[in-house]
């Protein structure tokens, strides 16, 4: 049955009494004020209640805190392990080696925490042999390397409030979010003289957490030439070296070019299927030392999508006067490489405890935030510094893992062994 307009209106709810617009404005302002006060006390008393998307973006934090909380601060090279061998004979259960005292050197647990470190590639370095052809020398180097790997594992187990194991990008990110304040601990060897001429040994190192291998240290080996001796042995990478690079690609181990000759570096860029790293090197253009990377090789690194992790070693930082090397000089190297090939390819590789002293302002591991603040003050963006302080090297590690997965059907490199029966 149809209804007239009057009938339709009778079904509508009564119209409310008019509210003066000034009263409505006061009411709205009062409500907003109460809401803001409630939010302030909620977030002040319970910071975890802050909206997750703002926490992820770090919009409520200073630029320095945004950098340090978006990614684990990751150092590509630290010699704490060999320092512990040299000065404590690898004894970490004695009263003079604790997690609450300052240890001799540039690294200890209180200073690591103050420096806000989130992940570390601990070098399990063993020096080159003075007489490499003497019987038993290669065995001793491999044994000593296993002792250094074991040392880091024992440190992780004995100091769990500070260290946590990691062997992948996923581990590092998981630890960063679920074990805050603990340092994800990965390993790196510093020269293929440490593998005793055996791909099998290199694979065992990988099983124990070694995620990068420098092709050389300060000596040539059967795989590659170092930058240190004047006379090259192979003219770069040997045939065996090409095979070992392919094996590292297959197993998911980063190829590290620090300490290698320029010819070795160029050869590696031509054969590797994965991004590479310089774990602790700087810009040759600013300090023309053979340990640093020239511009043309930085361009090759960009094409490879790899990373150079800027060293703090004074002799590689300020070639005019190493004793005058400073935090500002290190920042210059970071900016130079970032401006030349992009900050995507820059990281931090301190070499703490591998040098007699650090640059002024970067004397020990507690000083990382000062370097980050200097770069912020110079106008480097938060996003770029998130990459420099950890995002870039973790991206490289992730890419290396991806290449390894793509090579899963490739057979491992086998050692040639002597016939058992002759």
Curated annotation (Swiss-Prot):
- The residues listed in the UniProt record as binding substrate, with positions renumbered to this chain, are 217, 291, 351
Regarding protein family, the annotation reads: Belongs to the metallo-dependent hydrolases superfamily. Peptidase M19 family.
Gene Ontology terms: cellular component: membrane
Q: Where in the cell is it found?
A: Membrane
As cofactor, the record names: Zn(2+)
Catalytic activity as recorded in UniProt: an L-aminoacyl-L-amino acid + H2O = 2 an L-alpha-amino acid
Question: Which taxonomic lineage is given here?
Answer: Eukaryota, Fungi, Dikarya, Ascomycota, Pezizomycotina
Task: Point out the glycosylated residues in this chain.
Answer: 96, 270
- Record: residues binding Zn(2+): 77, 79, 190
Cite the annotated pathway. Mycotoxin biosynthesis
What's the protein called, per UniProt? Answer: Dipeptidase aclJ
Q: What is its main location?
A: membrane
User: What is the purpose of this protein?
Assistant: Dipeptidase; part of the gene cluster that mediates the biosynthesis of aspirochlorine (or antibiotic A30641), an unusual halogenated spiro compound with distinctive antifungal properties due to selective inhibition of protein biosynthesis, and which is also active against bacteria, viruses, and murine tumor cells. The non-ribosomal peptide synthetase (NRPS) aclP is responsible the formation of the diketopiperazine (DKP) core from the condensation of 2 phenylalanine residues.
């Amino acid at each position: 049955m149809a209804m007239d307009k009057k009938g339709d209106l009778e079904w509508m709810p009564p119209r409310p009494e008019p509210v003066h617009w000034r009263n409505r404005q006061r009411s709205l302002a009062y409500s907003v004020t109460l809401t803001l006060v409630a939010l302030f006390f909620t977030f002040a008393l319970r910071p975890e209640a802050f909206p997750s998307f703002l926490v992820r973006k770090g919009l409520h934090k200073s630029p320095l805190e945004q950098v340090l909380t978006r990614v684990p601060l990751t150092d590509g090279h630290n010699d704490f392990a060999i320092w512990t061998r040299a000065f404590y004979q690898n004894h970490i259960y004695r009263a003079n080696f604790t997690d609450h005292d300052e240890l001799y050197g540039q690294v200890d647990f209180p200073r690591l925490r103050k420096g806000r470190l989130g992940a570390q590639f601990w070098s399990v370095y063993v020096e080159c042999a003075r007489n490499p052809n003497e019987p038993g020398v290669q065995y001793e180097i491999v044994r000593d390397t296993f002792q250094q790997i074991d040392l880091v594992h024992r440190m992780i187990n004995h100091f769990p409030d500070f260290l946590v194991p990691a062997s992948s990008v996923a581990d590092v990110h998981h630890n960063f979010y679920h074990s805050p304040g603990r340092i994800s601990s990965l390993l790196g060897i510093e020269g293929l003289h440490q593998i005793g001429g055996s791909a099998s040994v290199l694979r065992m190192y990988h099983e124990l957490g070694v995620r990068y291998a420098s092709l050389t240290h300060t000596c040539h080996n059967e795989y590659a030439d170092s930058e240190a001796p004047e006379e090259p042995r192979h003219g770069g990478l040997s045939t065996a070296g090409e095979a070992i690079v392919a094996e590292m690609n297959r197993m998911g181990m980063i190829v590290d070019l620090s300490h290698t000759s320029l010819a070795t570096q160029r050869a590696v860029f031509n054969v590797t299927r994965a991004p590479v790293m310089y774990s602790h090197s700087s810009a040759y253009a600013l300090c023309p030392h053979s340990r640093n990377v020239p511009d043309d090789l930085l361009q090759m690194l960009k094409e490879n999508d790899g990373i150079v992790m800027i060293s703090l070693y004074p002799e590689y930082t300020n070639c005019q006067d190493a004793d005058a090397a400073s935090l500002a000089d290190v920042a210059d190297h970071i900016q130079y490489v970032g401006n030349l090939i992009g900050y995507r390819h820059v990281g931090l590789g301190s070499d703490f405890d591998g040098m007699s002293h650090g640059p002024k302002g970067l004397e020990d591991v507690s000083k990382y935030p000062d370097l980050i603040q200097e770069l912020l003050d110079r106008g480097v963006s938060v996003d770029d510094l998130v990459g420099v302080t950890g995002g870039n090297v973790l991206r490289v590690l992730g890419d290396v893992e991806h290449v390894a997965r793509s090579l899963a059907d490739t057979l491992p490199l086998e050692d040639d062994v002597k016939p058992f029966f002759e």
